[in-house]
Amino acid sequence: MSERSVSKQKSSDRWYSIIAPEQFDRSELGSTFADDPEKIHGRTLEVTLGDITGDQGENNTKLTFKVNDVTSDAAYTEFIKHELARDYLRSLIRRGASKIDAAITVRTTDDYRVQLQPVAFTTKKADRSQEQAIRRVMIDLVEDAADERTFADLIDAAIEGQLSSAIYGEAKTIYPLRRVEVKKLTLEARPEEVAAEEAAAVDVDEADVAVE
């Protein structure tokens, strides 16, 4: 390789600041080194909420972001997952009590498909019917929350505790609860992906009708 080629390669190497979405105040999440912007596109980065807010008490909340746009010196991201640390969740489990969870897939008002996983911890052992009733409350309130919120607002409701508080307030009338959390929220599909899936489903349905 000529000296000129080596010099050109070195000059293209640069640091890129990794930037959080607007709802996280465009905070800098970190930095990465690359010789080609395309090598950064699609990368994921996991940080804690405490890394963003500076509050160590929020280090149990893990956030995952994915690079979806790269400029000359910055890599911008989208939110793809919120998850509570396993050690924290294990600390909430008590012998002789119930742990009730659910996985609920919903669609927000701006057509993002998201899965949320709330979990409730009772003070003592609940019976099967009580567990089912609490799970039903979880499903209903998560679906209601999605029906009223954009993707960004639903993320805020999960991370800031409004959703878990709403579940706690209603479910505790069924059986005494010690704590409710949203242990995980995952982006499953963006609006354009949802639209493409629906269009494909319509095409399949029309083909079935034509065959009949």
From Swiss-Prot:
GO terms for molecular function: structural constituent of ribosome. The keyword Aminoacyl-tRNA synthetase does not apply. It holds the Pfam family Ribosomal_S3Ae. The keyword Ribonucleoprotein applies. It comes from the Archaea. Keywords: Ribonucleoprotein, Ribosomal protein. Belongs to the eukaryotic ribosomal protein eS1 family. This is Small ribosomal subunit protein eS1. It comes from Haloquadratum walsbyi (strain DSM 16790 / HBSQ001). The gene is rps3ae.
